[in-house]
Amino acid sequence: MKNHPARPRPATAVLTRTLRRRRWLQWAGACAAAAQTAGFGSGVRAQPAATSEPPRLALLIGNRDYPEGEDLPPIHKNVRDLRAALERRGFEVDQGLDLDQAAARAATAAFAAKVRAARPDATVFFYFSGHGAQVDAENLLVSARINPKARPETLVRTSMTLTRDVINELPRRPAGLTIAVIDACRTSLRDVAGGEGLNQVEAPSGCLIAFATGAGRPAIAPADESRNTFYTGSLVKLLEDASDEISFSDLFRLVKLDVQNVMLNHPVLLLRQFAQFPFIAENTQISRRLAPLPEADAATAAPAPARFASRDEAADWAALEAAVWPAEIARLATDFLKNHPKSRLSGSAEVARAGALEAADILRRRDVRLFRTAFQPAEGLPANELVKAGRGDKDAAARVARNYGRNASRFDASRYEGWLQYAAALGNGIASYELALHYRRVEQPLLAAQFESRARELGYTPPPSLDNTRK
């Protein structure tokens, strides 16, 4: 990748750049030193101080029973198989099948009460598989026995909403991890070109929301009760087969890559043409691996395998974890996979490489004005957000942008625009719309129209109130 020259700066900025570089080297060195020694030659995985794994709680809702022609045969198998996979990963699982709105809300409220009573660092997993719909920019989880093609007012009256009834119902857990998985499907290929689908959302702090397909695009379910849907089938497979060491965040990115590969190589042409590409909205604060920690009293249990097979592997992983510039991340991840093909962290390295390669390509584009200096740490700028953004995390990129926005203490229009351009290019329709509103405020109507159009292409529908303020 070519290095874009930074914009000319006054000589007084030289000292500031030097200090920033020094802070960056100190931070990266500390990260590398900690990671290099963690987990080598020992069964103990680097982890925050804890005597045992925090509770793992899950609620699975699967609605198969819809009016004739709209039923979803794979859904009950989805729930059975996912429940078994989650239980093997240490989850206590509740489930509900073919629930109407009242029953689904009651199940979710009971689950939320259980979550509130658990430790604040618990891992929480909500799953819905059934029909989904979007009305007035709101994502709806369609109740059993309701026609998903019913009038909008009927759907609103009879369905759960993803934001109000699920995400907002579950307590905020910045010290824990909340995962919501929405596998909203249909079985008919005749509807796939209709442009229908769910809306883009942003995850609250501590939360990861995974959709089976991108905003505005349908997910197709096989008309066969002996098969899983494409997304849940991949999720179950990777829950069972992935290394214990990878994080839940990386798991869902591996699922995304796997589903994309399956769809793009599917023998049915129409499925290839309208391939579902999973969508992830993430704002997690901690990293939690797939395998739970041993119980505190398990002193006689066999030790877990060492995280790294050698000091070289530990050092190479430390260097990869500390990198923030996409081209460097891609190079280090490629080298790691080449030098340590059997690493327990190879899945995480694959995720880092895929995200960084996409990010590096985007940063070469003329319509993304973001340079390497933007990835250097700065006072008050969360370093973990830069790390995520360098790996192609569209939501982290948007959060970095807002550190430079009009209401931020460090307002910098150039950085604000550049980071939002980058987030939009990574697929963040909300960031694209935010940039359109910014350009409208500063009287650049052509750019405003361009990014508003881009937001809608990405499947983002602004709420009616926000849309009205724009006009």
Where are these regions (language model features)?
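Hydrophobic face of amphipathic alpha-helices that form TPR/SEL1-like repeat modules
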Residues: D335, R399-N407, E434-R441, D467-R470
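Short coil/turn linking the two alpha-helices of tandem helical-hairpin repeats
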Residues: L320-V324, D361, G405-R410, R441-Q444
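Short helix-capping/linker turns of helical repeat alpha-solenoids
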Residues: R391-K394, N407, L426-G429, L458-T461
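Cysteine endopeptidase catalytic domains of the caspase/legumain-like
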Residues: K2-A322, R331-N339, R364
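Short solvent-exposed coil/turn linkers within tandem alpha-helical repeat scaffolds
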Residues: L337-E350, R391, Y460-P462
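Structural signature of tandem alpha-helical TPR/SEL1-like repeats
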Residues: P326, A374-P382, S409-W419, E443-F451
